[in-house]
């Protein structure tokens, strides 16, 4: 499953990337020469204009500016444009178009320490999601092996909790390769230490099934305090099932432990 943690990651990335742009940009005007920005402007100026236009609800102007900046090689604009296509935000939703742009970013690569690293990582994660689910009506078919490889790259090289969680899920299910429960537990444990609610829930359920009843139930309970509404349903089902078969002593211990987990005093 693709959780809202991924969308939050995209939102945070955009916020960090445009901090300088916001500081340097003035009021947004129409995309013309009088506004000081045209298609001949530099890629960073076009990116700044595109972001300001987007923020002001002028999404057609934002798309136009991002396109011109992307044609000039601006990675952040490519990424923003891909997200708009993926979400149907200001343009007709087109996952295949988003896939193609994310692929361009991934193929371009990044130098160590590059300011474009976040865009590159996000593109890899987006591509992994597309390969995992495929894109109907397009040449992009489900390729679980490729999805697993991309999740592994992002999880191991960049330590992104969402990638660690998705990789672990595939390892547990034996998707895209051999099942590897022990490796899956390792990745889930890393992701849950970063506060990923899905990883907390799944890792907790595994511990519960292995006999660590109170600790497993505590992690599943703590996950419910962190999950986004759209992701809470399956976590609630896991927690309620475990809670229903746990004895009273384990329930009480789990509640106490869940508070420690929530405050970060339990690792």
Swiss-Prot record:
A Pfam family the protein falls into: Sel1
Keyword Cytoplasm on entry: no
Signal found in the keyword field: yes
Keywords carried by this UniProt record: Exopolysaccharide synthesis, Signal
Signal peptide (UniProt feature, chain positions): 1-23
Highest taxon listed in the record's lineage: Bacteria
A single GO BP: polysaccharide biosynthetic process
Role noted for this protein: Negatively modulates exopolysaccharide (EPS) biosynthesis.
Identification of the protein by name: Exopolysaccharide production negative regulator
Organism: Rhizobium leguminosarum bv. viciae
């Amino acid at each position: 499953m693709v959780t809202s943690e991924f969308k939050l990651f995209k939102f945070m990335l955009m916020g960090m990337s445009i901090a300088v742009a916001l500081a340097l940009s003035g009021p947004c005007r129409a995309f013309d020469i009088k506004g000081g920005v045209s298609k001949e402007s530099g890629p960073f100026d076009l990116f700044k204009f595109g972001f300001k236009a987007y923020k002001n609800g002028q999404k057609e102007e934002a798309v136009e500016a991002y396109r011109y900046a992307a044609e000039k090689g601006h990675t952040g604009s490519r990424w923003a444009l891909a997200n708009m296509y993926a979400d149907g935000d200001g343009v007709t939703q087109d996952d295949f178009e988003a896939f193609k742009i994310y692929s361009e970013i991934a193929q371009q690569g990044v130098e160590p320490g590059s300011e474009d690293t976040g865009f590159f990582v996000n593109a890899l994660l987006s591509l992994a999601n597309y390969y995992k689910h495929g894109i109907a009506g397009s040449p992009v078919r489900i390729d679980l092996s490729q999805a697993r490889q991309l999740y592994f790259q992002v999880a191991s090289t960049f330590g992104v909790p969402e990638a660690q969680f998705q990789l672990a899920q595939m390892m547990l299910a034996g998707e895209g390769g051999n099942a590897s429960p022990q490796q899956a537990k390792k990745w889930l444990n890393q992701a849950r230490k970063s506060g990923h609610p899905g990883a907390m829930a799944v890792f907790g359920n595994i511990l519960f099934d292995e006999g660590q009843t109170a600790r497993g139930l505590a992690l599943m309970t703590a996950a419910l305090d962190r999950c986004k509404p759209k992701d809470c349903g399956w976590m609630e089902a896991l927690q309620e099932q475990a809670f229903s078969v746990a004895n009273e002593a384990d329930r009480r211990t789990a509640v106490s432990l869940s508070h420690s987990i929530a405050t970060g005093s339990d690792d």
